[in-house]
């Protein structure tokens, strides 16, 4: 039986979960993250979703769509305030609804939401090794009928059969109370990125009965971000006379910095917001920089109006349920914004008890939705996995080449590690692109996922040692880790889609690889020649920095380095690349000899260029 999933389609982040052995399990996306940013970007004819979309937002503010949940199921006239806050264009649709305009093309909020759902489902399908077509999707308890229908339509656009739309606090209570014995009265305090819900339930003997619910669909963590944005913009305008909110790129930078500051102030008492080159002075045309300290006390002052708005729904829910705070057994915190200390203090003051932190506020809603999906689907069966890997597995390396770590038909379980390094000086992060297939070039193979290893100490190119390990366990689940040896910093991704291709598709890929063998060999050879020249250039630059040679030899070496750069950028033909590499290595050798003669010392630097003449 195919699996049904539970999806928390959030304002700022989304999560997908499935029931495994009767327990809800959150599924990581292709980037190895359990939480996927609810962000869609349109760039150069390509659509990005999630972390990749969020990462490029500053450079593409008008083409990066976030917080779309605030617009779904709403009329344009209802969203004037929200529309002013975002850098992208929000325009009225022909039906009076909301549209997002990107480069002349109009998108409905349902379409954008469907792209997020599709990303979640496709990544989850790969992890599970089977196509997902059914889902339970959660919405804020305070969503109206139009918003609920629009959310269900987004699911259908994404190719899903939406089994049920359920309320987020109810889903959270399901996850919390699944294994509980006895009766409890629970208040779920759900403050997400864009919405606020309070729901009171009685839980007992597997029955989850909602007694009352209240909320505010215009209140969430992003409102706290915007409070910081407004403060920063006002302070900057006072000092420099420049309105940062009028510049879409500057506004996007402010939004990202504000979110980061809010998160930091949950664990520290003070943070510094630093945004260099945020604007130009109108008179002198010189760059202006923003640097501002923000204390937790000041942050709490800025969000005080928002904190006051939390009280009404709690009091209303208690009143509707006919309960006093003393009759509430547990208060469950849900949503990332509940990590803000001032929010937790409001809960203590209103309910007179310490909130229960036994659930993960980011994941519990999706887990509850997965439980509901499991109930609706009946018994969930185990996933059947093959005992060999049907196609080669590897990573993309410099020049767009696929480097194979585990060849096809390797018996599992198995583990294979390789050492890689950086391509540029002072590179502090690498992106690991995991691939499956038989073609030499990465672009011709199936992409299984990407993840980043960050925090690499700045070092010359070729010095860091990054150990990438592929580990396929007995269940056929692929785990990929990347570790920088000097710091021990590590990143990982788990991919369960290594066997999702049909036998016909596997055979087609193998046959295609044979047909393209000669073309692929030439392309790979070309990539290797470019890599060899670029590696020689990087090492030659290091020699210039570290050794003092004769002026004439230095000039020759600098000229050879310049030529190498030009040829690589121009994507020159193979003979030119090969000749330039030989010329550069010769210039390095002459420079080294001159430097050694001048110092009277023997050789202490060895140039190890990864160059191999073509056959």
From Swiss-Prot:
The induction text for this entry reads: By stress conditions e.g. heat shock.
CDD domains, sorted: ASKHA_NBD_HSP70_DnaK-like
User: InterPro entries annotated for this entry?
Assistant: ATPase_NBD (IPR043129), Chaperone_DnaK (IPR012725), Heat_shock_70_CS (IPR018181), HSP70_peptide-bd_sf (IPR029047), Hsp_70_fam (IPR013126)
One MF term in GO for this entry? ATP-dependent protein folding chaperone
Gene3D superfamilies membership:
3.30.420.40, Actin, Chain A, domain 4, Substrate Binding Domain Of DNAk, Chain A, domain 1
On the tree of life, the source organism's domain of life is Bacteria
Keywords associated with the record: ATP-binding, Chaperone, Nucleotide-binding, Phosphoprotein, Stress response
Is the Ion transport keyword given for this protein? no
Which sequence positions carry the modification called Phosphothreonine? 195
Q: Which SUPFAM superfamilies match?
A: Actin-like ATPase domain, Heat shock protein 70kD (HSP70), peptide-binding domain
Functionally, this protein is described as follows: Cooperates with DnaJ, GrpE and ClpB to reactivate heat-inactivated proteins.
Q: What does the sequence similarity comment in the record state about its family? A: Belongs to the heat shock protein 70 family.
Q: Print the miscellaneous field.
A: In the resting state, the DnaK-DnaJ-DafA complex cannot bind substrate. As the substrate becomes sufficiently high, DafA is displaced and an active DnaK-substrate-DnaJ complex is formed.
Q: How does this protein assemble? A: Forms a heterononamer with DnaJ and DafA in the resting state. Three copies of each protein are present in the complex.
Instruction: Report what the protein is called.
Output: Chaperone protein DnaK
- State the species of origin: Thermus thermophilus (strain ATCC 27634 / DSM 579 / HB8)
